[in-house]
């Protein structure tokens, strides 16, 4: 509600620590804060004292003001397309928080991109399960449905299994956008045990396009309310085994690729041109190409250009300069290859790459995908230690017996 009137929105994740909240409020020089009573304790007294206004986001009651007679005088400032709309703080993969500055043009162009890539209508029902502080959720699950006139249902708290199942049954959504973790948990918790109990396990592994696979896929669709026509997955790489099942079960999924810095969508894969492990092609109005390509492996860094690319990092011109090429392309730090059809396959993050003893490039993400697919593993991280690769594994609590 504030952005159309020239104000700047700075969302903060609800699970942020007191220090993280303090750092964001101080770095952004915020003057007004909307906060629930439940999370008010995360705003330090020092921060509250610097605020012009503190408002209860649930009741819109003024909790604190530097003027007891404070009133809204209705003054507005109509923004231009290149004015700042929002600053999204993200730690990314390098640790230190970055304030990603996105303009009205950045967000609006990505909404139009979504419409050209996947048309939704006022008849669609969206179920929102991700934090609104993510650009994926803000652009694709709030602004885009508004543009389409669709209805969005929001969960009151993080989507634990029981809450999500109840919401799916009630809403019967036609559209959802999630991170891979949600569909991977459903696959490991419901689909995989069904496959493993089947006497046709060996046959199915070799022929996952068989009748049994289709039947399980229909049951999976029913789990999501029975009306799903578009299930978007983004934010991280999807487990290849899970994607292979979704593809052969004819589940209506699509893979999206992007970053906070690009508002976020850059590429997508859906319908008949989906293939396991690829995010497909650039979306409408966006250009992608590989930079500094290794002639032996074909690997290069994905760089992007389009109206959705951020203005820069807030108060950090040096970091901003470092992520753009001399001719203005944004450097994603994602290393990828392209196949003969031009589809992109991400290998890993440039900053995460480990140089092997024979000079080969090792991407921890590829090893982690294999480990995470093992029975009893919840998640893992692979690092280099004294010249050797070491995997830290978190067991699945439902599987491991202590």
Question: What name fits each language-model region?
Answer:
Residues 1-10, 14-18, 26-32, 124-125, ...:
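A short helix-loop-beta submotif of the ANL/AMP-binding
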Residues 108-125, 132-218, 227, 252:
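Conserved AMP-binding/adenylation subdomain of ANL enzymes
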């Amino acid at each position: 509600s504030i952005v159309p009137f020239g104000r700047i929105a700075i969302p903060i994740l609800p699970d942020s620590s007191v220090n993280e909240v303090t750092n964001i409020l101080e770095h952004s020089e915020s003057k007004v804060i909307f906060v629930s009573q439940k999370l008010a304790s995360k705003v330090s007294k020092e921060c509250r004292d610097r605020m012009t206004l503190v408002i209860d986001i649930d009741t819109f009651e003024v909790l604190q003001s530097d003027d007891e007679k404070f009133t809204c005088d209705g003054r507005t400032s109509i923004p231009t397309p290149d004015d700042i709309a929002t600053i999204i703080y993200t730690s990314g993969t390098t640790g230190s928080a970055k304030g990603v500055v996105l303009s009205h043009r950045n967000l609006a162009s990505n909404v139009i991109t979504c419409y050209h890539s996947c048309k939704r209508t006022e008849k669609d029902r969206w179920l929102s399960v991700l934090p609104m502080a993510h650009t994926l959720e803000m652009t694709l699950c709030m602004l885009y449905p508004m543009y389409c006139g669709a209805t969005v249902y929001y969960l009151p708290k993080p989507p634990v299994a029981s809450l999500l199942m109840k919401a799916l049954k009630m809403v019967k959504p036609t559209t959802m956008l999630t991170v891979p973790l949600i569909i991977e948990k459903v696959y490991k918790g419901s689909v995989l045990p069904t496959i493993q109990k089947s006497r046709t396990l060996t046959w199915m592994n070799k022929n996952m396009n068989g009748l049994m696979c289709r039947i399980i896929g229909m049951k999976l669709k029913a789990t999501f309310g029975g009306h799903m026509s578009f299930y978007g997955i983004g934010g991280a790489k999807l487990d290849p085994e899970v994607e292979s099942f979704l593809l052969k079960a004819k589940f209506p999924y699509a893979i999206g690729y992007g970053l906070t810095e690009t508002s976020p969508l850059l590429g997508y894969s859906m319908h008949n041109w989906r293939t396991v492990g690829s995010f497909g092609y650039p979306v409408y109005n966006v250009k992608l190409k590989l930079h500094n390509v290794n002639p032996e492996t074909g690997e290069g860094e994905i760089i992007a250009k389009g109206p959705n690319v951020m203005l820069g990092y807030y108060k950090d011109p040096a970091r901003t300069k470092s992520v753009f090429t001399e001719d203005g392309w944004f450097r994603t730090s994602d290393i990828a290859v392209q196949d003969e059809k031009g589809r992109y396959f991400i290998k890993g993050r440039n900053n995460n790459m480990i140089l092997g003893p024979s000079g080969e490039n090792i991407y921890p993400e590829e090893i982690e995908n294999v480990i995470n697919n093992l029975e009893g593993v919840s998640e893992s991280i692979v690092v280099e230690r004294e010249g050797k690769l070491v995997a830290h594994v978190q067991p699945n609590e439902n599987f491991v017996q202590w």
